[in-house]
């Protein structure tokens, strides 16, 4: 698998008074890509427990250049940097367009913790979740 790539289309309403996508809306773009990976791809690969609960424990975003809404989608790349028993870290690269060669507008990381909503506490990753996430580890090449 390697790098997960999502194409997300920013909305006109994502822009602020300065004519670029507001920083908070950039976080929403990250969320949309993450949901596609964890709940979309994860479910298709048997990691269905992710849909039961996942919380963001930490979020860091570095903004490199303004992102302007021009009607095209942006490329969001995600890799798993760290995989632990009860948490994992995702790294994101957001490009200004659909191509890998388009300018990088932001990089980010999230620390995610699987969460048992019934018990109201964190839980360990299942074997299926670990196997799925391991396919997106940084440095793993796509087949």
Where are these regions (language model features)?
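HotDog/MaoC-like acyl-thioester-processing domains
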Residues: 6, 68-72, 81-143
């Amino acid at each position: 698998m390697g790098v997960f790539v999502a194409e997300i289309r920013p909305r006109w309403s994502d822009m602020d008074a300065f004519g670029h996508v507001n920083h908070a809306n950039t976080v929403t773009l990250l969320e949309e890509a993450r949901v596609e990976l964890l709940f979309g791809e994860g479910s298709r690969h048997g990691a269905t427990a992710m849909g039961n609960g996942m919380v963001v424990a930490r979020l860091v975003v570095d903004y490199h250049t303004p992102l302007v809404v021009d009607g095209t989608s942006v490329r969001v790349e995600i890799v798993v940097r760290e995989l632990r028993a009860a948490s994992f870290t995702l790294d994101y690269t957001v490009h200004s367009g659909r191509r890998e060669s388009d300018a990088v507008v932001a990089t980010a990381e999230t620390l995610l913790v699987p969460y048992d909503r019934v018990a109201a506490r964190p839980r360990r990753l299942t074997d299926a979740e670990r196997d799925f996430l391991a396919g997106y580890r940084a440095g793993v090449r796509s087949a």
